[in-house]
Amino acid sequence: MAKFTVTSLERHLLLISTVIAVLAALIVSRGCNYLLKRWKLSAYPLYEDKKVTPIEELHSSRDLIAKGFAKSQGKEIWRINTTIGEVLVVSPKYIEKFRYGHGCSAAAYTERELPISAPGYEPFTFASNEWRQRNADIILHRLTGLVSNRKIELSEELSNALESRWTNSTDWHAVSLFQTMTAIVAQTTQYFFTNRELCRNDAYIQSLFAYSSLAFTEGRSLMKWPRVLHPLVARFHPASQNLQSALENVNKHIFPFVRERRAEISRRRFEAAQSGKETPLADEWVAWLDEKAGNEDYNPGVAMVSFSVASFHTTTDFMCQLLCDLARNPAIIEQLKEEASDVLRDHTWTKSSFARLDLMDRCMKESQRLKPIGAVFLKSRAQKDISVENGNIIPAGSLFVVSGHWMHDPAIYPEPEKFDPGRHLRHAEESKPNKPKQFTAVSPEHMGWGYGKHSCPGRFFAATVAKMLLTHILFKYEFKLPDGKLNQHAYEFTTEILVRRRIEEGALNLDSFDSIDR
């Protein structure tokens, strides 16, 4: 029998042929997957196919969403070309398909929206990796409980923050609505993450503001480069260097604070062990993070920015809009004061008293309905084919958002542009008695806080802060919009509001309140 041998050249040719065959198979496979995806997407109408829409416009423009559905020929899903690629806009009719987040990745969507692989964007990576659920647990189960048990401290910090920005002048004077609300919200929320000294440190608060601003403005300029080059380009790009410097400024404040708190926690635990006492519970932000991290190393400055960016923006945006809505409806201000005077007449902050501020709760829900934080929600990337109704499929690899246009649908909310807090009571009692009407509740008809697994975990904390802040404003200040702004529904970053300290605060002296949990 003949003996066959393989020369070195033949072995190399065989290896090269195998590699080429594998690469060809991968290319063909990817090509087929791409064509299959395009075929599935072709079932949905494309909005203005020759136009590339800024992704920020899609996220915020109710008019764009309305036009998209109007041009979609009755389809409940349509496509739009944006600066981050093609995005599917899905009707809230299908929201239940995404309740549990199966097959959806919010982190993958963020990767297309921001250059989070670049140095300086670590807080966004921190919020989207395995820490995502840990952060949600901390906010929902630890932070919410902490603020519930420390209402007096919350009231004191709100009082200080409000007086520092709106002053005690009894003469009418103009203040920047957005800037003052941002500062008040930042100081108050940071009190529960840090301490009184740091939350009142203007340099520290400004370092957080600077990072947040740069991340969403200058930092976006990196998106002009291919994503694979972001880590390299960031080493030389001025915007990325500015962002990294802003993060370092936050670290200068946070690192010493964390070292101090860890030392204090260790000291208390050591003393308890020495005396045979039970280990004291460290109910504070540093301890929560260390507990979640276990033996894993993490950057506390990155963690702080990750927690802060979202809370500043959402709560500030909401409070600005709420005050504008109330200023346009001054009769409701007096009704709110009457309700608070009755509910809080025993001069205590309690869980039950917050729950009984029903008119305030409905005003907040209505203001959020009129101007939610965005026009779309549940921004995600499909990790697999997601089947919805009537054979509709969200193809794997597709970017998609769920529209919030039901919040302005006249079939659900008659006269949808009207500020009518009573509609939520009627909606719950008449049309859908099983629908929750509370400000923090979520539903397909009201996705101001998101929906399902994507619901904002900080909404209970934010609602508590907002209710107490509004109560302080109602009894301590008069406020109104300047002439010419009364018919402008949505506030702008440049909007000013006229305020003056009340000479008589009425029956409630909020600064003398007690706190009893019942």
From Swiss-Prot:
Amino-acid positions noted as binding heme in the UniProt annotation, renumbered to this chain: 456
Main location as per UniProt: membrane
Any one Gene Ontology BP term: secondary metabolic process
Effect of disrupting the coding gene: Accumulates fusicoccin H.
Keyword terms: Glycoprotein, Heme, Iron, Membrane, Metal-binding, Monooxygenase, Oxidoreductase, Transmembrane, Transmembrane helix
Glycosylation sites: 81, 168
GO CC annotation terms, alphabetical: membrane
Pfam family membership, one: p450
Protein name as annotated: Fusicoccin H C-9 hydroxylase
Gene source species: Phomopsis amygdali
Lineage, uppermost ranks: Eukaryota, Fungi, Dikarya, Ascomycota, Pezizomycotina
